[in-house]
Amino acid sequence: MQCLRALLSFFTIIPAGVAKLDFKCAWALPYVVPPLVAGPAAAALWLGASPHVAYLLLLLMTGLNHLDGLADVADALMVRDRERARAVLEDPRRGTGGIFAVVATYAVATASTASPLQLLLAEVFSKALIVTVAAFSKPFKPGLGALFIDGARSTWPLALPALAVIICLRPAATLAALAVALALYAVAYQHLGGANGDVFGYLLEVSRVAYIVTWHM
């Protein structure tokens, strides 16, 4: 129960009252969190809200933590030196790369959003992917990212059924999104020499947007 509360605390805006984060049940991420995060957005879209309103609601339900990771990593990618790039992740100031990444992903996602199911499956896809990828990643520093990697390494096969279902439902879209998301993750991973919480937040955002865009394939 403590582990599930940790998932809610870290991946949603829902207050779970967790004193210590425990990701031993990281495998449950694609099953527990997407309905809570994308469910309200999908319902809003079904009731007639615009894609802009629906996607903003989805982002708010995540607590904006992962969007912050996207912006931080985008800023870090603008710096060639690895140590300086890692330092940029800790800088609270926002650079041009981060601003562009946030605006671009939002614009592309909202322009491509067409159905409630699309939002739900995109969230399941991103959550299943991060568990699987984290299991084969190494942290470049202690922290939440390292804790998540430890949890994912022992449980990641349990997240594969969620990814398999998504692939069966939309094969071309999912495989295309998978290729795009993994390529973008590889760029950040190689540039920074590993992963941390920001890199995983970046992966969550770009993989969700990639799936939303490729949905139309």
From Swiss-Prot:
Reaction catalyzed: alpha-ribazole + adenosylcob(III)inamide-GDP = adenosylcob(III)alamin + GMP + H(+); alpha-ribazole 5'-phosphate + adenosylcob(III)inamide-GDP = adenosylcob(III)alamin 5'-phosphate + GMP + H(+)
InterPro entries, sorted: CobS
Pathway: Cofactor biosynthesis; adenosylcobalamin biosynthesis; adenosylcobalamin from cob(II)yrinate a,c-diamide: step 7/7
Transmembrane segments: 6-26, 39-61, 95-115, 116-136, 162-182
Compartment(s) of residence: Cell membrane
Bilayer disposition of the protein: Multi-pass membrane protein
Cofactor dependency: Mg(2+)
Presence of keyword Oxidoreductase: no
Family affiliation: Belongs to the CobS family.
Role according to the record: Joins adenosylcobinamide-GDP and alpha-ribazole to generate adenosylcobalamin (Ado-cobalamin). Also synthesizes adenosylcobalamin 5'-phosphate from adenosylcobinamide-GDP and alpha-ribazole 5'-phosphate.
Protein name, as recorded: Adenosylcobinamide-GDP ribazoletransferase
Gene expressing this chain: cobS
